[in-house]
């Protein structure tokens, strides 16, 4: 699989300069309207979004592989329906359901990455302990608990993981796990009826936030903030939340970005988060390898475990696909 990614990435595909709505003044006005609604008791949180537009010089399939090479992992998907090409690089799990156990993993809370190890660790710790981001995260956890309760056996809704922070090539993200055992007789349509759209891309209360979004965002979001996934033989289903997802049509692309706005948010902070999330579109880097030098003595690598650990740190920092057993077998 990695070799296929390399082959497509090497072909190359570039995107022309972007057009963004809103500009900063429009964003500030939109932010103020949301905060006014929160202060008026209408809402607790709104996930506000807007599109970035551009022209694609090259093939959508090649661009997808370049994006995927720049940020491996997550829940990526490529769909071509004959008119539109959907390039989803989502890091967020909407749900996984095996017919009995239902897992959701809402993602709320973002911080930038840094090439400096100490600064990078500080950003991670700052996100993990941020009162604003924790409040935003727990609001959506409570919303998902309520949504899951519509499907769940009594007393089966659980939060086994709260405020986990995971590193991606361009950002740190905070997630929590919400699980439930579903009642007998539920099917996939019931799961979507109860959960869709994911609360992490609407806000809370969910219906009121969706009404606010419809009234204030200039156009429908399309596939962005929807769900893309797979249903396996036997019925097990995994779907992402279609964030970091671009739609290409006739050589032009559109990609939405946004953030959750609460009473504790600031316009400067949310604007910076929007800008930081757009960095993933620049992660269309050329393929590269990690070079490690080591000493062989009598056919054995000296300090092999230390070398493997160093290679793994480099791979994870650079977003390079890492399979420990394959590397160890090669040594």
What are these regions (language model features)?
Residues 217-218, 326-331:
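A long amphipathic alpha-helix within ATP-dependent nucleotide-binding catalytic cores
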Residues 1-298, 305-307, 315-318:
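Extended alpha-helical targeting/anchoring segments
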Residues 314-327:
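Extracellular glycan-recognition regions
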């Amino acid at each position: 699989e990695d070799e296929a990614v390399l082959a497509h990435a090497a072909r190359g595909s570039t995107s022309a300069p972007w057009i963004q709505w809103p500009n900063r003044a429009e964003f500030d006005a939109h932010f103020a309207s949301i905060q006014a609604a929160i202060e008026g008791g209408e809402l607790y949180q709104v996930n506000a979004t807007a599109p970035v537009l551009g022209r694609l010089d090259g093939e959508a399939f090649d661009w997808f592989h370049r994006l995927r090479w720049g940020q491996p992992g997550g829940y990526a998907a490529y769909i071509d329906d004959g008119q539109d090409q959907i390039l989803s690089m989502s890091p967020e799990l909407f749900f996984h359901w095996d017919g009995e156990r239902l897992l959701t993993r809402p993602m709320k809370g973002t911080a930038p990455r840094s090439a400096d190890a100490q600064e990078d660790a500080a950003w991670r710790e700052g996100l993990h302990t941020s009162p604003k981001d924790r409040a935003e995260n727990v609001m959506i956890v409570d919303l998902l608990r309520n949504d899951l309760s519509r499907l769940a056996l009594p007393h089966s809704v659980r939060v086994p993981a709260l405020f986990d922070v995971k590193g991606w090539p361009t950002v740190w993200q905070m997630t929590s796990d919400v699980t439930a055992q579903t009642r007998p007789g539920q099917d996939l349509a019931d799961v979507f009826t109860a959960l869709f759209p994911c609360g992490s891309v609407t806000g809370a209360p969910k219906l009121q936030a969706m009404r606010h979004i419809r009234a204030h965002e200039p156009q429908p979001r399309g596939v962005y903030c929807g769900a893309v996934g797979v249903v396996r033989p036997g019925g097990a289903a995994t779907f992402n939340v279609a964030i970091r997802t671009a739609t290409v049509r006739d050589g032009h692309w559109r990609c939405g970005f946004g953030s959750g706005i609460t009473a504790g948010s600031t316009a400067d902070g949310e604007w910076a988060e929007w800008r930081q999330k757009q960095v993933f579109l620049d992660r269309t880097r050329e393929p590269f390898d990690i070079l490690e030098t080591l000493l062989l003595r009598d056919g054995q690598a000296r300090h092999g475990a230390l070398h493997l650990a160093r290679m793994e740190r480099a791979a994870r920092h650079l977003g390079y696909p890492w399979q420990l057993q394959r590397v160890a077998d090669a040594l």
